[in-house]
Curated annotation (Swiss-Prot):
Component of the elongator complex which is required for multiple tRNA modifications, including mcm5U (5-methoxycarbonylmethyl uridine), mcm5s2U (5-methoxycarbonylmethyl-2-thiouridine), and ncm5U (5-carbamoylmethyl uridine). The elongator complex catalyzes formation of carboxymethyluridine in the wobble base at position 34 in tRNAs. Involved in cell migration. Its main location: cytoplasm. This is Elongator complex protein 6. InterPro entries: ELP6, P-loop_NTPase. It comes from the Eukaryota. Component of the elongator complex which consists of ELP1, ELP2, ELP3, ELP4, ELP5 and ELP6. PANTHER family: ELONGATOR COMPLEX PROTEIN 6. It is found in: Cytoplasm; Nucleus. Keywords: Cytoplasm, Nucleus, tRNA processing. One of its GO terms (biological process) is homeostasis of number of retina cells. GO terms for cellular component: cytosol; elongator holoenzyme complex; nucleus. Pfam families: ELP6 (PF09807). It comes from Homo sapiens. Belongs to the ELP6 family.
């Protein structure tokens, strides 16, 4: 995890809020560093994590996790991490006969209109364990990234339904957290992606939006991060708070600074 990002969010693994949905969004840049942050954050918080990885392999996340001080292999072996490798699973679903229901069952069903098998996978992965097994602080669902489901033929409404049922189970029933990534293509004609992004934005308690620089590439500033806290239960004056920082990604950390305050500029 990135300590500077924790400081900006005013949180640590031992005092994170529960029952929250965090939306990660990237536009004209790669926001995967946010996924790696939250994955390592919740593993260090001793949470039970269900990771639906639709865009990269387990080895990719494992290599980055080692740099951030967590072992995904050990976490999976001890039952703390349940990992659905979408790339590999998609091949199995399409080219191999499956007797048992598969989380990505919709890939081989032309008229599949829902993600119920994927939800059942998440619910089974995060259900409370018996008292004799390892006890985790609370469950966490992490998805990277939901936009892939649209590319695979699912509609935005079906994906939002999936998120609704996951929230009901993970956030409300089990008092856990959810973190999902959605890519913002910036294409005005991509109505499905806009519906998904807007729907999730209204449901989220925290939105982290990574954006590329309007001026283009810079060696010392890789992008900017917009942080939006949404607190519906608070008075109007304190309901939504937004801050913007620029950042530079390094090998094992990310540095954040106010706009125009890069050490290279000063």
């Amino acid at each position: 995890m990135f300590v500077e990002l924790n400081n900006l969010l005013n949180t640590t693994p031992d005092r994170a809020e529960q029952g929250k949905l965090t939306l990660l969004c990237d536009a004209k840049t790669d926001g995967s560093f946010l996924v790696h942050h939250f994955l390592s954050f919740y593993l260090k918080a001793n949470c039970k994590v269900c990771f639906v990885a639709l865009i990269q392999s387990f080895s990719h996340y494992s290599i980055v996790g080692q740099k951030l001080g967590v072992s995904l292999t050990m976490a999976r072996e001890r039952g703390q991490l349940v990992f659905l490798e979408g790339l590999k699973s998609a091949v199995d679903v399409v080219f191999q006969a499956q007797k048992e229901p598969h989380p990505l069952q919709f890939l081989r069903e032309a008229n599949a209109g829902n993600l119920k098998p994927l939800f059942e996978f998440v619910r089974e992965a995060l259900k409370p364990v018996d008292s004799g097994e390892a006890r985790w602080t609370y469950p966490v669902l992490l998805v990277d990234d939901l936009s892939v489901l649209l590319s695979l033929g699912m509609g935005a409404v079906a994906v939002l339904d999936f998120i609704h049922y996951c929230r009901a189970t993970v956030c409300w029933e089990l008092k856990g957290n959810m973190v999902v990534l959605v890519h913002d293509s910036g294409d005005a004609e991509d109505e499905e992606n806009d519906i998904l992004l807007n729907g999730l934005s209204h449901q989220s308690h925290l939105i982290l939006r990574a954006e590329g620089l309007a001026t283009g590439f810079c060696r010392d500033v890789h992008g900017q991060l917009r942080i939006l806290w949404r607190r519906p239960s608070q008075p109007a004056v304190h309901r939504d708070q937004s801050f913007t920082y620029q950042y530079k990604i390094q090998d094992k950390s990310v540095s954040f600074f106010a706009k125009g305050m890069s050490p290279a500029v000063l």
